[in-house]
Amino acid sequence: MSGETFFLSNHSVAASQIAALAGLSFVTEDFAISAAGALATAGIGEICYMDDTKYIEELKVTRASACLISPRFKELVPGGTFSFVTPHPYAIYAQVLALLYPEATIPASNFGTNGISSKANIHASAIVGHGVTIDPGASVGPNARIGGFTCIGSNAVIGPSVRIGRNCYIGANVTVAYAVVGDRVIIHPGTSIGQDGFGFTFLGGKWVKVPQVGGVIIQDDVEVGANTTIDRGSMRATVIGEGTKLDNLVQVAHNVTIGAHCVIAAQVGIAGSTTIGDFVAIGGHAGIAPHLTIGEKAQIGGASGVMCDIPAGERWVGLPARPSRAFFRQFAALKRLAKKK
């Protein structure tokens, strides 16, 4: 079955403009790039990138008009492909993609329309800013505020008194309750924000629910992946810091504070009242126990189980998680011991 092309570039980018993005001087005759492609499939008028030894063979046979390439691979680029040599090929490639396919950078209405659908349910007391798009089936509750040029997808629910900033995208089937959302926030489909935290106490031989009376604060420029859940705080807010990016299927429990510009991969679970500093990176399927502090710029490997605080700037891996050097030393020692048997 042949694949459909869902993103067609209606733009072209001059090679000299790409060179400027990469901080390079452009000394040859200018030419246009009209699309992007993978190393193995890119052709005339298209640009690709390469920065990993896994793709050397594909690089050798690429037919792309141009390639953003790490310095260590520049000699391998075929003669018919123009090389933009940069230490950051993927980052420059991302900027070129944004120029070629601006609609892929910021999601828009699934219906390709602007304005408020007659099939949306908007409470009379809600305040909806200029240029807002609300798709069919979406609901906006009493006293909610939607900032200008925000898009609310089909069947999304914006709860009472929720605040959504400007230029946001709230995907289809998203629920936002008891929350304040900043500007330029992207929330992908199926995500739930502001539901009860998991609070129970054992009393009289049974589990008794502890009312969760906090909220959620999502600061500017945050992106939240599909089917992620962010619980509201028990007494104070659960906070997602400015510029932080959450992947799909991430669980953020009540009272968690995540700092600015963190990246958290899919299936990470962060238990209640844990504090994560700025610029922290967490690999997929990692779990973090409650009431911990993860220092700024720390890195946590995928599938790690974090049971104690992590100092700033350290890299921890394993289950239970420990400093990466200690983990790999212990792993090597076990291998040597196994060979002796």
UniProtKB/Swiss-Prot annotation:
Record field: catalytic activity = a UDP-3-O-[(3R)-3-hydroxyacyl]-alpha-D-glucosamine + a (3R)-hydroxyacyl-[ACP] = a UDP-2-N,3-O-bis[(3R)-3-hydroxyacyl]-alpha-D-glucosamine + holo-[ACP] + H(+)
Repeat in keyword set: yes
Entry EC number(s): 2.3.1.191
> Its Gene Ontology biological processes?
lipid A biosynthetic process
Mind telling me which GO cellular component terms the entry cites? membrane
**Stated family:** Belongs to the transferase hexapeptide repeat family. LpxD subfamily.
Describe, as the record does, how this protein assembles with itself and its partners.
Homotrimer.
Q: What is this protein called?
A: UDP-3-O-acylglucosamine N-acyltransferase 2
